[in-house]
Amino acid sequence: MRFLNIFLFFAAIIAFATASQVFEEDEIDMEPRITCDLIGNERLCVLHCLAKGFRGGWCDGRKVCNCRR
């Protein structure tokens, strides 16, 4: 009985670990597009890009923030 419990414990850990790896590969990073719509327009876009490590950014005609490299 003890061997069965240990076996099931390790089988559950392995199943969980492999399921997590597959999920991370299929995950899409969706970010809301609110930096160009709120008060300050391009200021929030520039701050957003600076926080991500870029040199700045601007809002295009579709109100989408574009970061400079």
Swiss-Prot record:
Keyword Cytoplasm: no
PROSITE patterns from the UniProt entry: INVERT_DEFENSINS
Residues spanning the signal sequence: 1-19
Molecular-function GO terms, alphabetical: potassium channel regulator activity; toxin activity
Record's subcellular location: Secreted
Presence of the UniProt keyword Disulfide bond in the record: yes
Propeptide: 20-33
Cysteine disulfide partners in this protein: C36-C59, C45-C65, C49-C67
Keywords, alphabetical: Disulfide bond, Ion channel impairing toxin, Neurotoxin, Potassium channel impairing toxin, Secreted, Signal, Toxin, Voltage-gated potassium channel impairing toxin
Single GO BP term: defense response to Gram-positive bacterium
CDD domains membership: DEFL_defensin-like
Tissue expression as described in the entry: Expressed by the venom gland.
One GO CC annotation: extracellular space
Protein family per UniProt: Belongs to the asilidin-12 family.
Notes on the domains: Has the structural arrangement of an alpha-helix connected to antiparallel beta-sheets by disulfide bonds (CS-alpha/beta).
Annotated function: Moderately increases Kv11.1/KCNH2/ERG1 currents and shifts the voltage-dependence of the channel activation to hyperpolarised potentials. In vivo, induces neurotoxic effects when injected into insects (tested on L.cuprina and A.domesticus).
Additional information: Is abundant in venom, since it accounts for 45.2% of precursor counts.
Protein name listed in UniProt: U-Asilidin(12)-Dg3a
Organism: Dolopus genitalis (Giant Australian assassin fly)
